[in-house]
Amino acid sequence: MSEADQLKALRVRIDSLDERILDLISERARCAQEVARVKTASWPKAEEAVFYRPEREAWVLKHIMELNKGPLDNEEMARLFREIMSSCLALEQPLRVAYLGPEGTFSQAAALKHFGHSVISKPMAAIDEVFREVVAGAVNFGVVPVENSTEGAVNHTLDSFLEHDIVICGEVELRIHHHLLVGETTKTDRITRIYSHAQSLAQCRKWLDAHYPNVERVAVSSNADAAKRVKSEWNSAAIAGDMAAQLYGLSKLAEKIEDRPVNSTRFLIIGSQEVPPTGDDKTSIIVSMRNKPGALHELLMPFHSNGIDLTRIETRPSRSGKWTYVFFIDCMGHHQDPLIKNVLEKIGHEAVALKVLGSYPKAVL
């Protein structure tokens, strides 16, 4: 058989497979519509039916990855199913999601990675505004950055948890790649100013010192804002990601300029609904201890003695008084698990205040 005949036969087979895939996706979408009908009919009329279930989404994606036999890798297969699930959920109830804007930020990329591209995304000017939108019920969920592998905790987010009564419903980790972007009219040999968010400038400090040591570095509210500015300036460049480059029509003068090759940011999904256990969860808490010697040791001992893994601990000044502090702690497990429940009870007896921010599925993607 000639090469042309072989290719023709393969394309006919691919076309047939595409038709089968189309039929199955359509059947899945009709099932999603039926789920919406059943939930709406049985839900109390005074309340809005809940269609998005974080624990169910996490289980489906993990199940798909367990069943996958290749040649696509597990994450790529999960991303495909994430988009199918996002589209089907939009038939039931389009999700409204707030994130730290403007368009083109890593926060938007994190929102789309977690919820898929069928959500109604709403950019906000500040992290606190994302919290306020969720508390007010203007959106179903918010996406906020909480820590970076290079620069550490995002203090604006931690402080917002002290001010708002809100639930953590999930997490998403995003690999961060920074590029040096320029516009069509930029004279690349005459760049005198580089815009970016302060954290991004810090994450690319060594590269900038080596390649643009005498160029002014200007911190702005977001990388997307940096990209917008560069579009209209001939003597400036921006440090931002792929989404901002595509959105604002910029070219990459240099790619992946972050100082550390493994540079990622963790984002939290905030909302109002408690998430049931999945068997692979994290719990986030805020604790305020009495100001006395050994307070931190006393706080951590119940976790250690019960073999519970702590994945993060941060300290922030308390708003209640001078020289008092609160601890933000993430641990493995769900607050309904008997072991975690017992530890929290022990801590609660010694703490000035203890608040469970939420238990949620560990990031799948």
Curated annotation (Swiss-Prot):
SUPFAM superfamilies: ACT-like, Chorismate mutase II, Periplasmic binding protein-like II
Annotated ACT domain residues: 284-361
Gene Ontology molecular functions: chorismate mutase activity; prephenate dehydratase activity
GO biological process, one term: L-phenylalanine biosynthetic process
Pathway(s) of this molecule: Amino-acid biosynthesis; L-phenylalanine biosynthesis; phenylpyruvate from prephenate: step 1/1; Metabolic intermediate biosynthesis; prephenate biosynthesis; prephenate from chorismate: step 1/1
Domain of life of the source: Bacteria
Catalytic activity: chorismate = prephenate; prephenate + H(+) = 3-phenylpyruvate + CO2 + H2O
Annotated Chorismate mutase domain residues: 1-96
The name this protein goes by in its record: Bifunctional chorismate mutase/prephenate dehydratase
Encoding gene, per UniProt annotation: pheA
